[in-house]
Amino acid sequence: MILISQNITNYDIQIPENAVFRINLAWVNSINELKKLLELHKAHDIFLDLPINRTKPPNNRYSLEGIISILQDHNNVKYLAVSNVNKKEDLDEYITKIPKNITIVPKIESSIGVDNIESITNKLEYKERIIMLDHEDLYTDLLKL
């Protein structure tokens, strides 16, 4: 998978046809802006990053309930990254509510999440399981040990 950040749009760089376009909702200011981004990149599969319990700026403005209709209306959203997954139970609400055509990607940002990574991945019922490790937050947490 070639995963391209939304930051690439700040430069005059062509997005490869087979790339998955990542949109981090921490950097999207409104639902209307998200809809425009999804429409602009409708030719690409989308990896949507939903920051939950984000403590550093910019703070997340969205909840799962707030984006469910977006997920249902945009078939090109193929992945949803969920921040701060520390244990398998953190995924329960997402597994229940997210459309089945979207792959949930747990984002591990703490040593607790690393310790529970096997049970977290086993909770996912996909042929291919994807985990995202947040290098900055995870590194900061590991330094505290």
Feature annotation, model-predicted:
Residues 2-145:
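Conserved alpha/beta-domain cores
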